[in-house]
Structure formats: structure tokens, C-alpha cells
Regions:
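Glycine-rich phosphate-binding "P-loop"
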Residues: 1-3, 57-65, 424, 430
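N-terminal carbohydrate-binding accessory modules
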Residues: 1-11, 32, 211, 432
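Aromatic- and glycine-enriched glycan-recognition loops and surfaces
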Residues: 2-26, 448-449
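Short, surface-exposed connector motifs at secondary-structure boundaries
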Residues: 9-18, 82-86, 439-441
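Non-catalytic positions within long, well-ordered alpha-helices that form the structural scaffold/packing
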Residues: 9-12, 35, 287-288, 460
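Substrate-binding/catalytic cleft of secreted carbohydrate-active enzymes
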Residues: 18-302, 307-314
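Carbohydrate-binding surfaces of carbohydrate-active enzymes
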Residues: 224-227, 236-505
Length: 505
């Protein structure tokens, strides 16, 4: 019990109030700890595969009966715990919707106190809601109706954090209730589709997706985040038991062979800072969305398997990696989050900066308050302040607009936009950058080429101005620029993409 309390107290200090157990059910001590701390628990049946009907290929009735009985045992032994709130039939399942619906129906007849779902991200590109679903968990509502910020390349299209310029303006409401039809996912002529399955891929049967699919039950976004950081080699010494950090040792050896080991600490800190920025935007996109019922971050701690997925702000021991404190994390992950909505973190000096302040609030006692919004340079110089009294409107409140004019600066200068609800612990901040006024370069007399050729070289020898804008498709060894960390584990998903004959990450 003490260890479960330790782990869950740490998670709760980071604003987490919910645990989903990937294809497993924890022991009773976990439920006791969750009861004591106020954590919502969602155990899953121990299954990640295809639910078949009798007579179908690979049908195993004995296995299916075992799974169903496991579910009844979970309800019998743990169902009375107040924390046992939800239950899932497994992870990323395929197969018979009828059997899944019947299984849930049996559990509801036995114990209807819980909320049930057919699974987490079932049918992947072909999402659906069955009759007995109490809520929906997934990553998309159609091929291009995405409800999380990042994806593996084998699950493309990629998310907004991977493809868009950094901003604080994304939400999923127009995706959940779209104004126009989305693109549906196509299946092959034999009615199959290739999917990622653990660390590999498999082929499953699928029917055409409904591009207009709109769940009429609460929507939970599945396994969000997954932003990887560089290894912290100082963690190697923490492995004092039977397990050793051989993966970290290999990574360190590779870095040393390249003569880059002195940069290891910088790589760790810089990649971690970027990962935290990605997580902040990921979480705030959820909290900005009025039509989302919740989220399940894949993990707040590192995962040592699947090729090494260092996606946590905590390491595998649940210790802080020093990238962000729990109080800083709670600015954008809590039962009340005040946010600013704006289009760019970079503002030209002398220009106007506009932001919209809003509050996502699940505190019944918070009926209203006063917003204080301040923009200041890193030096402490206050550019402007806006104060606004408001009345809380349910779970989501549009508070006000704020507009500031940035002063002239001679060099790139950091500014901080701060928001707080006066007299509470609800506050948030955004690091902005003011850049000097950009003078446009006159290139009217320049000769522009997309490659270095004889004509370009001849013009250069004549003293002419030549600008080379390369064709990116010809730069075989280049890395596409984007402001985001790798997803989960580069090596694992690179292999899966190659198996599925899709582009490398």
C-alpha cells in the first residue's frame, strides 16, 4: 500500500486525478490508495487483439471465456471500491462489435455502477460507438479529424503540434462537431488495413469509416503526449538492483564515439525543455476544448521498454528529471486552468499582441473572481496589465480579450504573459519573444536558382547576386524542420513504418 500511495501522491501533485491501466488490473492495494487519494481508476481486460465470433478465423472460445471471466472477477473483488469508476474491454481492439457489446452488457447486468467502454482506441482509423458504450476513447474521429497533438508516422496524418508553427490557439471542438465532411479512411480491395500492433504491425479486417462520425457519449482522448527527451546519463547510477540501465550505457558509448559526450547534459536539458513546451500545448488544447470529456496522457514517467521511450517529466523511478516542477506543471494540468489563446509566441517590436483569456473550471466552489493579466519584459518592465471581474459559466468561461503593444527592442528579448485568478492558486504563464523590427531585404536584383548549376556559377564569377533556394525533395540527407520532439521511440516506429511501407518518421 505504501508504494501505491507514494506513486499516486506524486501523480496527484502533477494534477493527475485518473489512472487507466493498459491491458491489466492493478491489485487491491492500488484501489485502496486511490480511494484514499481521490483517484478515478479504469482497469482494462488483459487483451490487445481481435475479438472474434464463433466460426471466424483464429477464434478461440476458451481464451474469450477466460477474458470475460477475468472481467467478472475484477468486478467481484474490486468493484466495491469507490475509485473503481470505469472499465475498458482492452487496448486497441478489433473484431466483432456485437461480441464486445454483449460482453459489456453482461457486466452492466452484473454491476451497473461503473462506466464502461468497448476499449481504448478500438478500430483506430474506423472509430465507432456501440450501444453499451458509456464513453468513447480514441485518437481520431475520422482519418483527418484528429483529437490529439502528436502521432507516429505509421498513424499519419500527424498532429498539430508536429505540423503547425508554435501557438496557443488549438482546440478540438470544430473537429468533434465539424462543419464539413472529413476524409474517410480507405480499406484495401480485400477489406483489410495494416495497423501498428505493439512493436510490430498486423493486418486486420475493417469496414469503411464513417467520416461524419460524432459520438453522443463523452469523448476521452487516448495516450496523448509521448514527447521524448534525451537520456540523462546520471540516472545510470540509480540502477542498484538486479536491473541495469544497459540501454543508457549503449547510448552513452555511441555519443562518446562521436566525441559528443561533453554535450550530453545540454542535449538532455534542451530536449527536455522542448518536450515540456509540447506537453503544455498538448494539455491546453484539451482544456480549451469544451466538447472533450477528458484525456489520458500516455505517461508522466519514462517507459524503459519498446526501444526506450523517455517520454516522462519523471524518470522510471517517478523522480523528477528537473525539467519542470509539479507546481509549474499544474499551471496547465489541474482541476482549474486559466489560459491565454494567441497565434504566435514571436512578436515584432512595435506591433500589437492580442490574446483571449479563458478558464476551464471543475471546482464547484469557484463561482467567479478577478482575472489579472500582465505582460512584462524579462527585465521587469511592465508593458501592460488587464484586470477583469467574471462570473464562472459552468466548466468553461470566456473571460476577456487583452491587447498590448510591444515596445521597440534592439535584440531578441524575452517577455512573459502572466495570468492569475486573484486570491487563488490558479495561474499560468507564457514565454514570448519580442524581435527587432525586421527590415525587408531587396532581392529585386538577385538571380534565384533551386540548385547550383553552370549558369549560377557563371553569374557569381561576374559578381552578380545569386540566391540558392534548394528544392527540398532533392536534399536526401536533410531533416525536415519542425518544432516538436520525437514521438515515443524513433527506432521502434521507424521499423513499423518501413514494415507498413510508409514514410520514415
Amino acid at each position: 500500500l505504501e508504494e501505491w500511495l507514494r506513486v499516486m501522491k506524486i501523480s496527484k501533485s502533477y494534477g493527475m486525478n485518473h489512472y487507466r491501466y493498459h491491458t491489466c488490473c492493478p491489485p487491491e492495494s492500488a484501489f485502496i490508495a486511490a480511494d484514499m487519494l481521490g483517484i478515478y481508476m479504469e482497469p482494462q481486460l488483459p487483451f490487445w487483439g481481435t475479438i472474434t465470433e464463433e466460426g471466424e478465423e483464429n477464434h478461440n472460445q476458451e481464451e474469450q471465456d477466460f477474458l470475460v471471466e477475468e472481467g467478472f472477477n475484477m468486478l467481484k473483488f474490486f468493484g466495491n471500491h469507490p475509485s473503481y469508476c470505469m472499465m475498458s474491454m482492452g487496448n486497441e481492439l478489433w473484431g466483432s462489435k456485437k461480441i464486445l457489446n454483449d460482453i459489456i452488457g453482461g457486466y452492466k447486468k452484473f454491476d451497473n455502477r461503473h462506466l464502461y467502454t468497448q476499449g481504448s482506441n478500438n478500430f483506430q482509423w474506423f472509430p465507432n460507438v456501440i450501444e453499451n458504450d458509456d464513453f468513447f476513447v480514441g485518437v481520431r474521429l475520422a482519418n483527418d479529424r484528429l483529437i490529439r497533438g502528436s502521432y507516429a508516422m505509421c498513424d499519419a496524418p500527424l498532429g498539430h503540434i508536429q505540423t503547425d508553427k508554435p501557438a496557443a490557439n488549438h482546440d478540438y471542438d470544430s473537429i468533434i462537431r465539424p462543419q464539413k465532411q472529413a476524409n474517410s479512411t480507405e480499406v484495401s480491395e480485400d477489406g483489410t488495413v495494416q495497423i501498428q500492433y505493439g512493436t510490430t504491425m498486423k493486418t486486420v479486417k475493417a469496414s469503411e469509416a464513417d467520416a461524419d462520425f460524432i459520438p453522443e457519449v463523452p469523448i476521452v482522448t487516448h495516450e496523448i503526449g509521448q514527447y521524448e527527451t534525451y537520456p540523462n546519463f546520471k540516472e545510470i547510477e540509480k540502477y542498484t538492483g538486479s536491473l541495469k540501465a544497459r540501454n543508457f550505457e549503449i547510448f552513452r558509448e555511441r555519443l562518446e564515439e562521436k566525441g559528443l559526450l561533453p554535450l550530453a547534459e545540454d542535449y538532455f536539458k534542451c530536449s527536455g525543455k522542448l518536450a515540456v513546451q509540447c506537453y503544455k500545448e498538448e494539455m491546453e488544447a484539451v482544456f480549451r476544448s469544451r466538447l472533450l470529456g477528458g484525456f489520458q496522457i500516455l505517461d508522466i514517467q519514462d517507459f524503459s521498454g519498446q526501444g526506450t521511450a523517455l517520454v516522462g517529466v519523471l524518470n522510471a523511478f517517478m523522480d523528477s528529471k528537473g525539467l519542470i516542477t509539479d507546481s509549474e506543471w499544474r499551471e496547465f494540468c489541474n482541476d482549474a486552468v486559466v489560459m491565454a489563446r494567441f497565434d504566435s509566441y514571436v512578436i515584432e517590436a512595435g506591433s500589437s499582441f492580442k490574446a483571449h483569456a479563458e478558464l476551464c473550471n471543475y471546482r464547484p466552489e469557484l463561482k467567479g473572481g478577478k482575472l489579472i493579466c500582465t505582460l512584462a519584459l524579462e527585465s521587469g518592465e511592465v508593458i501592460g496589465k488587464v484586470e477583469k471581474d467574471f462570473v464562472s459559466e459552468g466548466n468553461y468561461t470566456d473571460i476577456c480579450d487583452a491587447e498590448f503593444t510591444f515596445p521597440q527592442v534592439e535584440k531578441n528579448t524575452k517577455a512573459v504573459l502572466s495570468l492569475e485568478i486573484e486570491g487563488t492558486d490558479i495561474h499560468n504563464h507564457y514565454d514570448l519573444w519580442a524581435i527587432p523590427t525586421v527590415e525587408k531585404t531587396d532581392i529585386s536584383g538577385a538571380y534565384i536558382f533551386d540548385e547550383v548549376n553552370d549558369e549560377a556559377e557563371s553569374l557569381l564569377k561576374q559578381g552578380k547576386t545569386v540566391l540558392i533556394v534548394p528544392n527540398l525533395s532533392r536534399l536526401e540527407n536533410s531533416i525536415e524542420g519542425f518544432y516538436c520532439q520525437d514521438f515515443w521511440c524513433y527506432h521502434m516506429f521507424c521499423i513499423i513504418s518501413q514494415m507498413m511501407k510508409k514514410p520514415d518518421p
